[in-house]
A protein has these predicted regions:
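Short hydrophobic core segments
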Residues: 87-90, 260-271, 446
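A glycine-rich dinucleotide-binding beta-alpha-beta segment and adjacent secondary-structure elements
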Residues: 47-54, 60-63, 235-245, 249-251, ...
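Glycine-rich loop(s) and the adjacent beta-strand/alpha-helix scaffold that form part
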Residues: 265-322, 326, 462-479
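Glycine- and aromatic-enriched mobile tails/lids
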Residues: 1, 70-71, 75-86, 102, ...
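An anion/pyrophosphate-binding glycine-rich loop and adjacent beta-alpha core
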Residues: 1-11, 296, 302-413, 417, ...
């Protein structure tokens, strides 16, 4: 059947689908579905890590190669400091900006280094909202329980408890900074319900939530005149030879020279791993999302958690080709949008958890009920015009202006026709193990945001990533700043790197790649 005919079927079946109520799967059905169809359960995509703190544990092959890869820094590198600071924050997204602002507020001398420009991050691409329990019908306890269930009960309880309890204070802080959250007709903060949540608790800024939060954070960093190094990518950490982190080596991307930063404490906020394109999946992540914190922390001895689980957002764009992998916000489903297969049928409760919805979409496509594009890709429909039908003309334009404009660039009107979607690599559920102050197992090395692990368990609920950034950016920055008041700078060495290389040489195939990779390689090979 032609694509246009399949699209017409979505319109023809809309009234019948509006009368349906799809129950959520039972726990047994969910487990069976995820085990059979979710990419986390493809054994061939995984292998054991050969050495280091996580030796013997399995992760995806792409990440294993990075963890076992060699540093680009030579053993005889000149470690004379070019910069000296109390707190070095690596990463210019939401977590990094929150960390540096709170460290600065506590009186520390701070330096923010970012691989690209300030604000170039996954944070600016977060559309769905930030989960914070602020209404009388909700509570941090309910937020805790929803997140624990969504994470398959594998969340670190203390990290989770801390996040949900500090949510309301984060909302207050963001409002004071000037974030323009959506409000209802009475001027109260408007909350929406997200997938896997039992209560409406999403605070939104249309479908620009992350961009709006990043706008005010970026402005505040600049207003506070915080020292900033842009286009300066961290490539190696420094230690004192006793297991403590004492700084980092950055690479100036303009001239390829190394910058040596002596720091009493280091906070890594380098974000996710999507640009590794795990298992060949497209990604919603920004160009610099190459998991840089993981190999650097690993070489220094930090333990990683839950690095065998990744989130594939259910609704990544499949058509047009220019948007492959781009996020189609969960907010569409939160406001009533249906997922529809090639037969014009709904097949999953659209507000189930992301792993369940993604697995259901993959099942439909693998069992022959997907829609094939003109370039051979498979997907299912997201019935976007349904929102205007249900809530009145102009609903999409008002609540999802970014998405409407994004598709209009390619001649597609999502207010009139549905869009094709398929899961896209979106988030690393695991990362560096941290405590409630964001500190790793390596003294004076902190990790905040997506680079850290333990908080989200084996599946993150929508809206929790932005809260994670704010809470653990704040806690890591504040803790690091207080600690440096009684510290002196430590010795700068690469002794940990020498030990890592010595161990790696015992294992065939190690040290073949350089890590961190910094940027994806999209160069087409000839021949």
């Amino acid at each position: 059947m032609q694509l246009q005919a399949l699209q017409d079927l979505v319109h023809k079946t809309r009234d019948a689908r509006r009368a349906q109520t799809l129950p959520k799967y039972s726990q047994a059905e969910r487990d069976t579905l995820i085990t059979k169809y979710h990419p986390d359960h493809r054994e061939s995509a995984y292998r054991a890590i050969k050495f280091g703190p996580n030796a013997g544990e399995k992760t995806v092959r792409e990440l294993a190669a990075l963890l076992e890869g060699d540093s680009p820094v030579p053993a005889d590198a000149d470690l004379t400091p070019t910069h000296s600071t109390d707190v070095l924050v690596v990463g210019g997204g939401g977590a990094g900006c929150a960390a540096v602002l709170h460290a600065h507020a506590h009186g520390a001398k701070v330096l923010l280094a970012t691989k690209l420009r300030l604000g170039d991050s996954n944070t600016v691409m977060a559309q769905g909202g930030i989960q914070i329990a602020i209404t009388n019908e909700d509570s941090p306890v309910q937020h805790f329980l929803d997140t624990l269930k969504g994470g398959h009960m594998k969340n670190d309880h203390q990290l989770l408890k801390t996040m949900v309890e500090e949510g309301p204070s984060i909302a207050k802080w963001l409002l004071e900074l000037g974030v323009l959250f959506d409000r209802d007709a009475d001027g109260n903060l408007h909350v929406k319900k997200g997938g896997g949540s039992s209560r409406p608790r999403l605070l939104t800024c249309s479908d620009y939530t992350g961009l709006e939060i990043m706008r005010v954070l970026k402005d505040e960093v600049l207003n506070q005149k915080i020292q900033l190094l842009e286009f300066s990518a961290a490539v190696e950490l420094l230690s004192d030879g006793q297991g403590n982190c004492t700084g980092a080596i950055l690479q100036d991307l303009d001239n390829k020279r190394y910058l040596v930063v002596a720091a009493k404490t280091v906070i890594l906020a380098t974000g996710g791993i999507g640009r590794l394109h795990i298992q060949g999946f497209p990604t919603s992540n920004h160009y610099g999302a190459t998991g840089d914190a993981l190999p650097m922390s690993y070489r220094l001895g930090a333990k990683l958690l839950q690095i065998d689980t990744f989130q594939y957002h259910p609704t990544g764009a499949v058509y047009p080709e220019q948007l492959i992998g781009a996020l189609v916000t969960e907010g569409i489903r939160s406001e009533g949008g249906h997922l529809v297969n090639a037969r014009g049928e709904r097949f999953v409760n659209e507000l189930d958890t992301r792993d369940v919805v993604s697995s259901s979409i993959i099942r439909e496509c693998e069992e022959g009920r997907g829609v094939r594009t003109t370039t051979g890709r498979l997907g299912v429909w997201l019935d976007t015009p349904l929102l205007d039908v249900e809530s009145g003309s102009g609903t999409l334009d008002k609540h999802f202006p970014a998405m409407v404009r994004q598709y209009k660039r390619y001649g597609l009107d999502i207010t009139k026709d549905p869009v094709l979607i398929y899961p896209t690599l979106h988030y690393q559920n695991g990362g560096v193990q941290i405590d409630v102050n964001g500190e790793s197992g390596v003294r004076n090395l902190f990790v905040a945001g997506e680079a850290s692990g333990g908080l989200h368990g084996r599946n993150r609920l929508m809206g929790n990533s932005l809260l994670d950034l704010m809470v653990y950016g704040k806690r890591s920055g504040s803790t690091a700043a207080e600690r440096v008041k009684s510290m002196k700078h430590g010795k700068l060495t690469l002794e940990h790197l020498a030990r890592f290389r010595s161990e790696a040489k015992k294992h065939a195939g190690s040290l073949e790649a350089h890590s961190p990779m910094l940027f994806p390689d999209y160069v087409r090979k000839e021949g």
